[in-house]
């Protein structure tokens, strides 16, 4: 039931691909509660997915950005602050990808080039994003930055493969950068793990 919990709050939501995405569902709820946001995803994902439908439904704009590119992230933040005429209140990082999982590589036989690419997209991108936000002083005080993690960052889930390592690094970045964001900017940084969902990076796992 809408009660405008996020009225006048502005932000960025990463990772909405289609209506099965957690980021998509989050965007719908944020809109329902009165929040406004810019939607973003990698350019190829924007072309493949149906994010424009979500933008229309939530009265949002779409700014494509490669989360592994500082230039793209800088442009995204600049465009967002220009759109809202000021700083923002929240960011959702809902990004994850493992080529090793998609290619069926066992954890004991990983392709390390794929491992590095997946780590860069799934975890290092969170540091890049916060670094850009921090350097541009883009967050309002008492704002919130949230990234999606998974319990495999702390426990053994063999089929989650190298994504478990990516999520562990993601959580470490949240703690480390969260210290500086909290101390200097009074901004909260957290990760959250869904209880049950179908992960698009893990086609062999349903409702993990």
Short names for language-model regions:
Residues 55-71:
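Rossmann-fold cofactor-recognition segment
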Residues 188-195:
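Conserved SDR Rossmann-fold cofactor-binding beta-strand/turn motif
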Residues 35-49:
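Conserved glycine-rich Rossmann-like NAD(P)H-binding loop of the short-chain dehydrogenase/reductase
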Residues 68-82:
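Conserved Rossmann-fold cofactor-binding substructure of NAD(P)-dependent oxidoreductases
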Residues 16, 21, 96-183, 196-197:
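Catalytic loop of short-chain dehydrogenase/reductase
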Residues 10-14, 88-96:
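Conserved hydrophobic beta-strands of the Rossmann-like cofactor-binding core
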Residues 198-204:
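Conserved small/polar residues in nucleotide/adenosyl-binding loops
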Residues 3-39:
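Canonical Rossmann dinucleotide-binding motif of NAD(H)/NADP(H)-dependent dehydrogenases/reductases
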């Amino acid at each position: 039931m809408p009660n405008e919990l996020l009225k006048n709050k502005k932000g960025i939501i990463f990772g909405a691909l289609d209506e099965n995405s957690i980021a998509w569902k989050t965007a719908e709820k944020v809109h329902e509660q009165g929040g406004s946001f810019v939607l973003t995803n990698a350019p190829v994902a924007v072309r493949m997915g149906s994010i424009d439908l979500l933008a229309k439904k939530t009265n949002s704009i779409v700014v494509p950005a490669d989360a592994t590119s500082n230039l793209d992230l800088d442009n995204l933040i600049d465009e967002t602050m220009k759109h809202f005429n000021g700083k923002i209140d929240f960011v959702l990082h809902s990004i994850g990808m493992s080529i090793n999982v998609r290619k069926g590589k066992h954890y004991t036989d990983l392709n390390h080039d794929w491992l590095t690419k997946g780590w860069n997209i799934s975890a290092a991108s969170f540091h890049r994003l916060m670094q850009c936000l921090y350097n541009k002083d883009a967050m309002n005080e008492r704002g919130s930055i949230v990234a999606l993690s998974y319990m495999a960052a702390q426990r053994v889930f063999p089929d989650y493969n190298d994504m478990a390592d990516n999520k562990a690094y993601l959580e470490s970045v949240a703690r480390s950068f969260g210290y500086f964001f909290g101390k200097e900017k009074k901004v909260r940084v957290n990760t959250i793990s869904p209880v049950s969902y179908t992960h698009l990076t893990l086609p062999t796992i349903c409702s993990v």
